[in-house]
């Protein structure tokens, strides 16, 4: 069943920007443990007064650090944190799987001659290992990871970068993701979004971030594209 969210507007879609884990792949990654490890490093620097916990989002934790310590210390902590996370991403990539029907959906969209890009907060190494395991390493027209941009979702930078790589205007694309940060990043970059409650967030929680559309899964995407209209001749 389709669940239309807030708007009923017709678009001519030429490209799809997708999140990876939680959207098309099952990817078990313990971000809490990575945050716990970096907070131990922070505590040794006598910075616990910043009131940070391992339950904070990665984005918020790094933002809080950046606002409260000098640039050199922040760069060092960020590199350590990304190192911790990359270790876990590499391990998790070995067990990554596609959601049922995701491959068929991707192939259908490719058959419609739509450009397809990935934008993820994962590392380049972890992302490439995951896509290679799933035999999708040469499938996407563009892949932007946290290593490719100074910003992370929910900031607009990574989305703008993938659109630039695809040579697509924001109004000619749609972003699909399972997280509130995907919806926020789409809004920041000026393109419509579709939420899928196949990750940590329920449909109700995603709707609070006001996506343009809410789908049951990525497998509903072809029907949405048909509804919106594509660039097919």
Regions found by a protein language model. Name each.
Residues 1-100, 104-112, 128:
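N-terminal helical cap/lid subdomain that shapes the substrate entry/recognition surface
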Residues 1-16, 107-111, 124, 128-233:
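Asp-based, Mg2+/Mn2+-dependent phosphohydrolase catalytic module
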Residues 120-122:
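Conserved phosphate-coupling serine/threonine residues in phosphotransfer and NTP-handling enzymes
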């Amino acid at each position: 069943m389709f669940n239309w969210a807030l708007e009923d507007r017709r678009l001519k879609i030429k490209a799809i920007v997708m999140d990876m884990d939680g959207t098309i792949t099952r990817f078990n990654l313990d971000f809490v443990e990575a945050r716990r490890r970096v907070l131990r490093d922070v505590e040794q620097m006598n910075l616990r007064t910043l009131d940070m916990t391992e339950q904070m989002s990665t984005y918020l934790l790094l933002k809080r650090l950046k606002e409260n310590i000098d640039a050199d210390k922040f760069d060092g902590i960020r590199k350590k944190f990304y190192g911790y996370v990359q270790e876990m991403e590499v391990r998790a990539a070995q067990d990554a799987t596609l959601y049922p029907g995701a491959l068929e959906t991707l192939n259908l969209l490719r058959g419609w001659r739509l450009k397809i890009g990935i934008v993820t907060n994962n590392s380049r190494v972890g992302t490439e290992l995951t896509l290679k395991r799933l035999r999708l390493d040469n499938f996407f027209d563009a892949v932007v990871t946290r290593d490719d941009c100074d910003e992370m979702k929910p900031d607009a930078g990574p989305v703008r970068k993938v659109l630039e790589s695809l040579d697509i205007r924001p109004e000619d694309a749609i972003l699909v993701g399972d997280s509130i940060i995907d919806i926020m990043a789409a809004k920041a970059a000026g393109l419509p979004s579709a939420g899928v409650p196949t990750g940590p967030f329920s449909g109700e929680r995603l709707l609070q971030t006001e996506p343009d559309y809410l789908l049951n899964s990525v497998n509903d995407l072809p029907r949405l594209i048909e509804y919106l209209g594509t660039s097919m001749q």
